[in-house]
Amino acid sequence: MRAVAVAWRRRARYHGAVPLRVDEQPYPVIASVIDPRSETYRAHEQANRAAAEKLAAALREATVGGGDKYNQRHLAACKLLPRQRVELLLDRDSYFLELCPLAGKDVPGHVPGASLIGGIGRVSGVECVISASESTVKGGAMSELSVWKSTRLAEIAEANRLPSISMIESAGADLPNQSKIFVPGGRGFRELTRRSAERVPTICLVFGSSTAGGAYIPGMSDYTVMVKQQAQVYLAGPPLVKMATGEDSGHEELGGAEMHSQISGVSDYLAEDERDALRLGREIVAHLGYRKAAAPLPRQVLPPRYPAEDLLGIVAPDIKTPFDAREVIARIVDDSRFSEFKPSFGSTLVCGWAHLAGFPVGILANNGILFSESAQKGAQFIELCNQQDTPLLFLQNITGFMVGKRYEQEGIIKHGAKLINAVSNSTVPAITVMIGASFGAGNYAMCGRAYAPRFLFTWPNHRIGVMGGKQLAGVLDIIQREAAAKRGEPVDEQRLAVGKAMVEGQIDRESDPYFATARLWDDGIIDPRDTRTVLSIALSAAYTAPVRGTTSWGVFRH
């Protein structure tokens, strides 16, 4: 079986909105012109299949925790592995969309996944943000990347109003790196209480140690479950208490599950064992009666007319090679139907309406560099989608805005600013998938990470940066030559060539999708063939919160 891009999830098909009746389909069907027999298609398919296999291998690596030695030690202590805890918490045959699964990959001092499992799954019929300490890696100690990932999961829970379930077994902060953790780590406690204040439930299941600052996670959660003879929650363990006060105390009397359940009241439920804790977690979610705040109009959900497998042959592995975004849209939206907006104006930005798993979406997809016309078209389209309370889907493959004397005089800056203004102030849910290049201000205009999309995923061919390595090295070459001319000095061609090669190599490394995802610039690299499934889950999660557009915008320069 092909390893799916959603790093680790239940084997289930996600159907999206429940079809209640067969509606008429007024949108036209996209007519694909792809020839699977062409040499170009076959070359793309071969390269993209290899990239997908590389991704699958990286995702498998991220599921092994601390490795066989520490996993066996964990099992020998009669404990469930962290991923088993997630599996048993989820509804039977449900899904788990793992988020940021490769955070920390190839970053010195870190492991893939950043010692924290996190994602979205259904528990007692309710979509929840689920996190679990990877307790087989340094006892689940939190690094600075663990904190970043935890913060990102909290952002997703808040923006989409999803209940959160934290499964804790952690040695706390990775003390040798405390200077990188202490200040940002405190934000997690603040956000936990803020979600509670906004009536977004927070649940904590404690399977082992949760000490020092980590004790505030169960202390500040709405509901806390502790496992008998395993959970240990205290601000200071026995050695530190002895050193600070001279008092002798044992782990159980100081912070054991029974003490907190019977005496301190920090624990709300005492679980007999780990499976009982998971049962109690499911029971808590069941009694919440949590409901979605929005729902699309019921409609028949039809799969695309073209196979997702085609995406491997359509999309160029080299970002310099263009491809038609409509061919991508045709393979992810319902029945391959798409109502295009202003098709003859600003043609390098494809805009239009479709449905995906029954959810309405307004799609903005790059079909070339952004000109003034395409920027104006995109801004107007975003205004229309906000007027209709329609979520936005950005398919980003952009090298930036057009430059040059003519375009500057035509006002490319002010027109680009209109699009960025619209993206910045839009209030409907936005989801971004980077299906190719993401350079310069094009990243901003197409709702990059800094513009707070609800979710942001990338494909393995993705590249990101201020500009490409060759372009940046070339710019520096021109600048250095001009500087030498001003000083009246000859150019050292050998030194300049070495410098250019070093800069180009650096930029190429830093624009690699694995470099980006390791640093949480996105929510995960996905196999192109899984795009529809991933977007279905993301849209469903977004509809847990109210879906409301705005008519308030910043000043548009005309």
Q: What feature does the model see in each segment?
A:
Residues 17-558:
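Ligand-binding clefts of soluble mixed alpha/beta catalytic domains
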Residues 1-22:
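N-terminal mitochondrial targeting presequence
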